[in-house]
Amino acid sequence: SSERYVIPGGKLWKRKCYANLRFPVGKIHEDQYITYKAFFDCNRVVTVDVSLYFYWVNPNGITKKGFSLQRYDNIEALTEARAFYLNNDKNDLAAKADSMRELFIAMYSIYAREYHIYADVDMQYKMSRMKAGRIIKNQLGYDSWEWHMNKCFPIYIKLHSYLKKICSFFGK
């Protein structure tokens, strides 16, 4: 795929790319707020299709903590990225940022319910379970949809999984 994640990890940067950029204080997903700006100012970006970066899992990092309202910082960052792209006449990138924003709202709607904090979620980030499921399935595919839906509807997904196996067994 020609699309790449725009996070700082796994990339080599010239110092000047970040010379005028600062990570926002008090935000998680802080890289989402500035990395797109660093890429935007680059004259040339080179990619290789080789795994050279190995992610270290911090047992105390945000990916290992439970879901919290702070995760919505990511959506705020995507909203800012969308505005940035629109201001720079990059409508295709604005559309991608908007699509990612919608996907994260969908996923976070599921997680917020699982962690019993949905009542505290800002209204602009609330989404029905059905709409969230549709967005996840359309953007990420069936397997990812099944995994996320298991978080919301564990009994339904188990039944769905059994029916799928039965149909497969009978060749249907």
Where are these regions (language model features)?
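Donor-binding/catalytic cores of nucleotide-activated saccharide
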Residues: 1-46, 56, 60-69
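Gram-positive cell-envelope targeting signals
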Residues: 8-9, 27, 39-42, 48, ...
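Hydrophobic alpha-helical core bundles mediating ligand binding, dimerization, or RNAP-core interactions
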Residues: 32-35, 78-82, 104-108
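Catalytic core of nucleotide-sugar-dependent glycosyltransferases
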Residues: 52-58, 65-91, 110-139
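Short, charged, amphipathic alpha-helical segments
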Residues: 93-101, 124
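Amphipathic alpha-helical repeat scaffolds of TPR domains
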Residues: 98-112
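Membrane-interface aromatic/basic loop that binds lipid-linked glycans or pyrophosphate carriers
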Residues: 116-172
